[in-house]
Design a protein with these regions (language model features):
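A general alpha-helix detector
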Residues: 10-11, 47-48, 87
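Active-site neighborhoods of divalent-metal-dependent phosphate/nucleic-acid chemistry enzymes
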Residues: 76-118, 122
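PIN/NYN-family metal-dependent endoribonuclease catalytic core
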Residues: 4-6, 24-55, 76-79
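Glycine/small-residue-rich phosphate/adenosyl-binding loop
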Residues: 49, 53-71
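Residues that scaffold the ATP/ADP-binding catalytic core of kinase and kinase-like folds
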Residues: 13-14, 51, 130
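Metal-dependent nucleic-acid phosphoesterase active-site entry motif
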Residues: 1-20
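Alpha-helix/helix-capping structural signal
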Residues: 9-10, 43, 83, 125
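Acidic, PIN/NYN-like endoribonuclease modules and their adjacent C-terminal/linker elements
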Residues: 1, 108, 112-144
Length: 144
């Protein structure tokens, strides 16, 4: 089982047929889904729910899929504590020229916490720039 950080793009694309990455996301998870353990955050989940706001059915399907993945041990959801906020604020300031949103900051925070640097994201440019606190780069496994 390969541990990966999961960003909103590939996960949200699974549930939006109009998303330009929908077919790629379907193919990626068909080929690799059973061998991946995805780690994400509530900030990423919130972003996905916003992206799927065009359809309560799509939002419900996503939440059920998330729950199923969690119960099967294929999806882990990390919770940011109030004590983590100063570190997130420092990251947002550090990458102000990008700019870094909370979902991205939460994934870098999670990488720092877990030492996982494999990621699936459609945001290749930003995750090519971001570094962990140990100065490790991210390896994007999503083929965009």
């Amino acid at each position: 089982m390969l541990d990966v950080l999961a960003d909103s793009g590939p996960l949200g694309a699974l549930f939006n047929r109009r998303d330009k990455f929908h077919t790629l996301a379907i193919e990626f998870f068909r080929a690799h889904g059973a061998s991946l353990r995805c780690h994400t955050t509530w900030a990423v989940i919130t972003e996905i729910m916003y992206f799927l706001d065009f359809s309560a059915a799509a939002q419900g399907d996503f939440l059920e899929w998330l729950y199923e993945g969690h119960t099967r041990g294929l999806m882990r959801i990390a919770t940011i504590e109030p004590s983590d906020l100063p570190g997130l604020a420092a990251m947002v300031r550090k990458y102000a020229d990008r700019p870094m949103d909370l979902a991205d900051a939460s994934l870098v925070w999670l990488a720092n916490k877990t030492d996982i640097t494999n990621i699936i994201s459609v945001d290749r440019a930003d995750f090519a720039i971001y570094r962990t606190s140990k100065r490790k780069s991210f390896r994007n496994l999503f083929p965009v």
